UniProtKB/Swiss-Prot annotation:
SUBUNIT field: Interacts with UvrB in an incision complex.
Cited NCBIfam families: PRK00558.1-5, uvrC
Chief subcellular location: cytoplasm
One GO BP: nucleotide-excision repair
Residue ranges of domain GIY-YIG in the record: 19-97
Function: The UvrABC repair system catalyzes the recognition and processing of DNA lesions. UvrC both incises the 5' and 3' sides of the lesion. The N-terminal half is responsible for the 3' incision and the C-terminal half is responsible for the 5' incision.
GO CC entries: cytoplasm; excinuclease repair complex
Name of the protein in question: UvrABC system protein C
Transmembrane segments: none
Length: 609
């Protein structure tokens, strides 16, 4: 049994749980809320978490941290569901699937509590009779929708309590025909309400019926010789038509439906919701998610379904999802049926147009997740480069960093490697391998001098760009020789540092005393990555060169092995596979190597052993 089960506090609390529905809160030793869940039967659900060798990875990880338990009993499972969503938003537990920045999601409000309602963006929902539409995934898309509404419908834009005690002068919106002027007292409440009802129809996605309604009103106004009002309806119809022409038709039979796509990578996820209203794709909403590493797809989608639709102003009768989440959404469906008067249908289409639409949502989710991860990585790398700039007092963040490492085996076959990072990421085209020419034996400082000289000379000859920082894998002696090479090449202005492996010590030119920076800082992590990549690249090159030299020494005295066959053998066994481990069959696979020659090579290998 996990140690946590022996804790008297939890054992005693479990005895008092009872079989009522409610929410349970697992807490850490420090009182942090780790996980929040709901249950139809609290006692049964909580005991399930305390099983030894639990099959769920996420639950096993939770077991290691739980220290205390709290719970809130409710009258029904539906009440538990609503409470669960509220508690998760309040505590944001790290073991729950979490939607990023949940508080930011905006709504469009139609202030029906006022005599002359306004239409505006808000994040606060009040229980005062106002009508809310959303949530939208970001402020930009909300503003675009609001802008369309304010261009189509002549509703007021100014925030003031109406009617005013004294009519004010008409504003520019009134002069342009974009407002009916309720602040002047020019329009009765009943007539203004008709326009507000049309706004609500538009936001509900009932554009077909809205177009029909406006067409009837335009004809009626024209028949009454009320040409001003008829012109207003005509203009509204034209603007709606222009808006609809920009929308994609995805369903010939019309209808309202939501299509949910989902993508995940490691601990991050992305949900895309496509809103189809009247058969037209109206809105794409994007919701980033965290904490999905050990969660099943059904759990993640179930959590999204709960958090989104419990707060959604409009719920369509049909919702397409990429996985079966009937069980995870049963309680939510009960609440929605009570709230809307109908139970939405969940479907996971396997073919046809609906499957194609679901694939579009999933593809958008993948693209959105990739874009977000890249943006996060770019922000992290930018922060790392900024930190390195501050660490070494550079003029600007080091956009190009190069690192050099020496590899040899007791001085034999010495090679050097140079790797390049651009904007904090490996730039493979800038990687370089060097066979040391001027030194034999163990002389790392001299070899560094040679490599830096060759590199800087090549940059000068090619009129290429100098790096913003050079990192030498080594201590003060290697760094001093690198600086000497830079001085000789007239490139002494290039900043250089040494990074020693033992304690991740940083050396500056002319200073034998190391500096120790925070090992866990983003700047040091990037420098270690750079140094380790240079070491990996160098070791790989050195191993390859040693293998070739070993093969040369093995085959150079074999009779009948000329230059051409030697090259073929070297090329064939140039990787991890060494010639001394070769079988006769493997030797025969080399072009130009027959039975007799293979036997001679094997005899030479055995003689060496």
């Amino acid at each position: 049994m996990p140690e946590i089960l022996n804790h008297i506090l939890i054992l005693e609390k479990i005895k008092n749980l009872g079989i009522s529905p409610g929410c349970y809160l697992w807490k850490s030793r420090k009182g942090e809320v780790l996980y929040i869940g709901k249950a139809k039967n609290l006692d049964k659900r909580v005991r399930n978490y305390l099983k030894e060798n639990h099959p769920d990875i996420k639950t096993r990880a939770l077991q290691k941290e739980i220290f205390d338990l709290d719970w809130i009993a409710t009258g029904t499972e539906k009440e538990a569901l609503i409470l669960e969503a509220t508690l998760i938003k309040k505590h944001n537990p790290r073991f729950n699937v979490r939607f990023k920045d949940d508080k930011k999601y905006p709504y469009i409000c139609v202030s029906l509590s006022e005599s002359f309602p306004m239409v505006y963006i808000t994040r606060k929902l009040k229980d005062n009779g106002d009508r809310y539409f959303g949530p939208y995934s970001d402020v930009k898309s909300t503003r675009e929708t609001l802008d369309i509404i304010l261009r189509i419908f002549p509703v007021r834009k100014t925030r003031q309590v109406l009617p005013l005690p004294k009519p004010r002068r008409p504003c520019l919106n009134f002069d342009m025909g974009r407002c009916l002027g309720p602040c002047q007292g020019n329009i009765p409440v009943e007539d203004y309400k008709i326009v507000i009802d049309q706004v609500i129809q538009f936001l509900e996605g009932k554009k077909e019926s809205l177009v029909g309604d406006l067409s009837i009103k335009m004809s009626a106004s024209s028949n009454r010789m009320d040409f001003e009002k008829a012109a207003r309806y005509r203009d509204m119809l034209q603007r709606i038509q222009n808006f609809r022409e920009k929308q994609t038709v995805v369903s010939a039979e019309g209808g309202d439906e939501d299509v949910i796509g989902f993508a995940r990578k490691k601990d991050e996820g992305q949900v895309i919701l496509l809103e189809v209203r009247g058969g037209r794709l109206e809105t794409k909403k994007s919701f980033p998610i965290q904490g999905v590493l050990d969660a099943e797809d059904s759990e993640i989608l179930g959590a999204f379904f709960r958090d989104y639709y419990l707060n959604a102003a409009l719920v369509p009768p049909l919702i397409f999802v990429p996985a079966d989440i009937q069980e995870e959404t049963a309680a939510v469906m009960d609440v929605l049926q009570e709230k809307t008067g109908f139970r939405p249908k969940l479907k996971s289409p396997r073919g046809g147009d609906k499957r194609s639409l679901l694939k579009i949502a999933e593809k958008n989710a993948e693209l959105g997740l990739t874009e977000r991860l890249l943006a996060t990585h770019y922000r992290d790398q930018t922060a790392s480069l900024k930190e390195i700039q501050e660490m070494f007092s550079l003029e600007h963040p080091p956009h190009i960093i190069e690192c050099y490492d020496i590899s040899h085996f007791q001085g034999s076959e010495p090679v050097a490697s140079g790797v390049m990072f651009v904007e904090g990421k490996p730039f493979k085209q800038g990687y370089r391998k060097y066979n040391i020419r001027g030194y034999k034996g163990i002389n790392d400082p001299g070899m560094i001098h040679e490599v830096i000289s060759r590199r800087l000379q090549r940059i000068a000859n090619e009129e290429s760009v100098f790096p913003d920082l050079i990192v030498i894998d080594g201590g003060p002696t290697q760094l001093a020789k690198a600086c000497e090479a830079a001085m000789e090449a007239g490139a002494e202005r290039i900043p250089m540092i040494g990074l020693a492996k033992k304690r991740e010590e940083i050396y500056f030119p002319g200073d034998n005393e190391p500096f120790i920076f925070d090992m866990n800082s983003s700047g040091m992590k990037l420098l270690r990555h750079l140094r380790d990549e240079a070491h990996r690249f160098g070791v790989s090159h050195h191993r390859s060169r040693r293998n070739k030299e070993t093969m040369r020494s093995l085959i150079q005295n074999v009779p009948d092995i000329g230059l051409k066959r030697s090259k073929l053998l070297l090329r064939h066994f140039s990787g991890e596979k060494k010639i001394e481990d070769a079988t006769k069959e493997e030797l025969l696979a080399v072009p130009g190597i027959g039975e007799n020659l293979a036997e001679k090579i094997l005899k030479r290998i055995r003689k060496k052993e």
